[in-house]
Amino acid sequence: MRPDTSSLDRWFSVPQPRPAAPMQLFCLPWAGAGAGAFQGWAAAAGPGLEVLPVVLPGREGRFSEPFGIDIGELADAVSARADRPYAIYGHSMGGRLGFEVIRELTRRGEPLPLRLYLGGCRPPDHVEPLAELSEVSDEELLGRLIELGGLPEELLAEPELCELLLPVLRADFTWLHEYVYQPGPPIEVPIEAFAGADDKSISVEAMRGWARHTSAGFTLSVEPGGHFFLRERRDHILDRVRA
C-alpha cells in the first residue's frame, strides 16, 4: 500500500527540492545515523540531481515513533516518492537496506533504480561482524564506533547526547544482528561499490563479493580513507552518480 502524502513526507528530508531535476538519489544511512549523515549533499549535487536522504523511524523528525526497520514500508516510501529515474546510495547498513528494497520492488514488479551505489557495506550473504555490537555494553559500543571514526571521542563527555544516541544504535545493530539473507536471483540493477582503503570493518576483497548479487554489471572503486570515507569523498561519489 502506498503511503499518503502526510505519511510519505516523514520518510524524507529534502533540504533542496528539485522537482525539475532529471534524476533522484535516495540516500540510506549507516547504523545509528539519520538523514543528517548526508548533510550538504543536496547543495553539492547541483541542479541536475534531487537528493533525498531517508529518515528512518525513531530518529530526527520521527523521534516519537518506535524504532524498527520494515523493508516493505521503506520500499513503499521509495516507490511512492520516485517520480522519475532514480538511484540509491547506501552506506554500511544503508547498503544492505538498499539491496533489500530493490529485491522487494523486484518482487512487486515496480520500477527499479538505475543503479545501486554502495559504500563500506559487506555483501548480504556475509556475516556482519559489527552486528555483535547489539549485545555489548554501552561503553564498548561507543568505544568501537569511535575507533571506526563514526563518532567523535568528545561525545563521551556528553552523557545526555549518549543517552539519546544509544537506543538508535542498539535498534540498528539489532536489525543487523537479526538479518538473515534469503538466497535469490541477483538483482537486475547495476551495482557500483566504493571501499575505503583503510576501512577496519570490511576489506576491499570482501566488497568484491557484491559482484555475484547483480546480473547487470559491477564496479568497485577504492577510496582513500576509512569506513566513513564518504565525508571526504562526497563530491567524487556525486560525480559518479551524475556520470
Please give the residue ranges for each predicted region.
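Domain-scale detector for complete catalytic domains at protein termini or as standalone homologs
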Residues: M1-Y89, M93-A243
